[in-house]
Design a protein with these regions (language model features):
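Boundary at the C-terminal end of the N-terminal hydrophobic targeting segment
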Residues: 18-22
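Positively charged n-region of N-terminal signal peptides that target proteins for export
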Residues: 1-5
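Extracellular ligand-binding/catalytic regions of CAZymes and related secreted enzymes
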Residues: 24-28, 42-45, 49-58, 67, ...
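Bacterial N-terminal signal peptides
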Residues: 6-16
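A glycine-rich, often tryptophan-bearing local segment used as a flexible ligand/cofactor-contacting loop or short
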Residues: 97-170
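Catalytic beta-strand/loop cores that center a nucleophilic Ser/Cys/Thr
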Residues: 62-64, 141, 149-223
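Helical hinge/lid and interdomain linker segments adjacent to catalytic or ligand-binding clefts
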Residues: 31-33, 38-121, 125-127
Length: 271
């Protein structure tokens, strides 16, 4: 009987501990903005759906989807609408100059830089606010060209230990549209993937980078916050690829601070 009582006590204690843990660790909140001004990417709707499902499957984050910029502010909104203060990270699958007033822009930068929250940029996020220097600085670069269009891109994995990289192997080929970046320097970011320049047609007249450095995916710090960008995700079918799904799922977790590594040292080196 004493043994039975001890077992019951242990079971109740374990249950109480589990409940306390779940109550003290609520799911993170992800805001996804899927708005474009100008060119429309057909893959956005499916991509956002995949991102939402990944959050549900892993039980780590809830996804709020918007096709406007109203939540990108810290001011109180009408009708109990949610704003940046309700989120742990923002994901942009966007394009063009979105409608944001100066205060909204300042709030978005502060959300990452000062509040230590996360920002994830997908593909055409690099064609967003190309003339807003602070946004370009936060992301780590901006669109210049896509010299080879959608092609069988030869990609090297530069840091296989970073979250979301190991499943790709050391190198791989993926049919996607890879952007050439300007206002980009690998000295200011942690490059995770790049094009294998030895397998590219560098005589293409749209190749503008003299260093032939074509980063595909990178991570960086912006103040206290974490920023992740990848040009992958142009074709809709790529969002059905488990490797791409895992990459973005772990990118979101990293940006939210759920997993390492801490890249603060990179920002310190830049300063």
């Amino acid at each position: 009987m004493k043994l039975f009582r001890c077992v019951l006590i242990l079971l109740y204690a374990a249950t109480a501990y589990g409940l306390a843990q779940s109550q003290s660790s609520p799911k993170k909140q992800l805001l996804v903005i899927g708005e474009e001004k100008g060119y429309r990417h057909a893959s956005i709707s499916h991509a956002i759906s995949v991102i939402e499902q990944l959050g549900k499957q892993k039980g780590l984050w809830d996804t709020t989807i918007r096709t406007d910029t109203e939540p990108l502010t810290k001011k109180k909104l009408e009708y109990n609408a949610r704003n940046l203060t309700n989120f742990d990270a923002v994901l942009f699958f966007t394009g063009g100059d979105l409608e944001m007033d100066p205060q909204q822009k300042a709030d978005l930068l502060s959300f990452v830089h000062d509040d230590g929250k996360g920002f994830i940029g997908v593909h055409s996020a690099a064609i967003t606010f190309t003339r807003w220097p602070e946004f370009v600085e936060m992301v780590g670069g901006t669109f210049d060209e896509h010299p080879w269009g959608t092609f069988d891109a030869p990609i090297l994995v530069e840091d296989p230990k970073f979250p979301g990289m190991s499943q790709w192997g050391k190198s791989f080929v993926l049919r996607d549209e890879i952007y050439q970046m300007k206002l980009f320097s690998r000295d200011k970011v942690h490059v995770l993937m790049s094009l294998d320049r030895g397998k590219l047609d560098l005589s293409n007249p749209k190749v503008h980078r003299a260093d032939h450095d074509f980063a595909v995916t990178w991570a960086k710090m912006y103040g206290k916050g974490r920023v992740y960008y990848s040009t992958l995700g142009h074709p809709e079918e790529n969002w059905n690829d488990p490797r791409l799904q895992q990459m973005y799922a772990e990118a979101i977790q990293w940006a939210m601070g759920l997993v390492g590594p801490d890249l603060t040292r990179i920002e310190a080196q830049v300063k």
